[in-house]
């Protein structure tokens, strides 16, 4: 009820202004009696995945807390894991505004943010100060002005800087809002990137005395053959997990709705079916050799269960969380 009232107010604002205000409020409320508005005690539903123990299988997807400013608030909501980022080596402003749009009738969002963030060093400082009990994922990307042929260097820089502080590292090569980025999902480009990341992981594991798993985040807009090739690369390079999926460029489900023609990636309920299908195809190809984190359109316990039945060991929410609030996390965890 409280969240429904708050949402009514937030939805009167421009989508990005509402997001920024929410982040500020989470920072302001953290550690004060006001955090009772979102703090909740959830039952333990432990899951072993990628060599880590998650207190429950419901995580926050990357993109909501790009700079790691609200880890403690999301931890207090009971998430089993929180993924911050996407973060890049250098700060960047992202694409021009407006760049975030609600499709309220479809419970969807279109964004063309463009990896706006304050840089990896800023994020690391925030993580170092935060106190939390959930698993922390850090999602890394490349700067917009880094040529795609040099993209691996950006991922390696970020990986080196976040390694010590991450529970796992998510490699984002599937955002539709950085020109050319999705080309890294295919063929030799993917193989070379994963090989370099794996070598860096071995080097950093020895240096820090701990193994931090790597998960690749992929797009929903892939053919069956492309999914098969990605699976082959993941197994060949001993990557630890795969996150499926990012946002979609497809507008079929929302055609004719307000904002449907805005450029960017579509998330929320309209991507639910396709992302679940990608999870299913990944599971068919990978079996139990590699864990899958399912994300895309999870707005209820039923939607989360569908992802798990398709083969996901963990799930993440973002757009569903915007529309339904912390109660969504509670409902999923309690019903598992």
UniProtKB/Swiss-Prot annotation:
List cofactor names only: FMN
- Residues bound to FMN are 62-66, 86, 139, 172, 217, 245, 268, 297, 318-319
| Disulfide bonding pattern of the chain | none
SUPFAM superfamilies tied to this protein: FMN-linked oxidoreductases
Q: Which reaction does it catalyse?
A: (S)-dihydroorotate + a quinone = orotate + a quinol
Pfam families assigned to the protein according to its UniProt record, in alphabetical order: DHO_dh
Q: Which GO terms describe its molecular function?
A: dihydroorotate dehydrogenase (quinone) activity
Q: What is the active site of this protein?
A: 175 (nucleophile)
The listed locations are:
Cell membrane
Enzyme Commission code(s) on record: 1.3.5.2
Pathway in which this enzyme or protein is active:
Pyrimidine metabolism; UMP biosynthesis via de novo pathway; orotate from (S)-dihydroorotate (quinone route): step 1/1
One Gene Ontology cellular component annotation? cytoplasm
Q: Which UniProt keywords apply?
A: Cell membrane, Flavoprotein, FMN, Membrane, Oxidoreductase, Pyrimidine biosynthesis
Chief localisation class? membrane
Membrane topology listed for this record:
Peripheral membrane protein
Cite the cofactor comment.
Answer: Binds 1 FMN per subunit.
Function of the molecule: Catalyzes the conversion of dihydroorotate to orotate with quinone as electron acceptor.
Homology family: Belongs to the dihydroorotate dehydrogenase family. Type 2 subfamily.
Subunit field text = Monomer.
Q: What is this protein called?
A: Dihydroorotate dehydrogenase (quinone)
Name the source organism: Vibrio parahaemolyticus serotype O3:K6 (strain RIMD 2210633)
> Lineage in the entry?
Bacteria, Pseudomonadati, Pseudomonadota, Gammaproteobacteria, Vibrionales
State which gene encodes it. Answer: pyrD
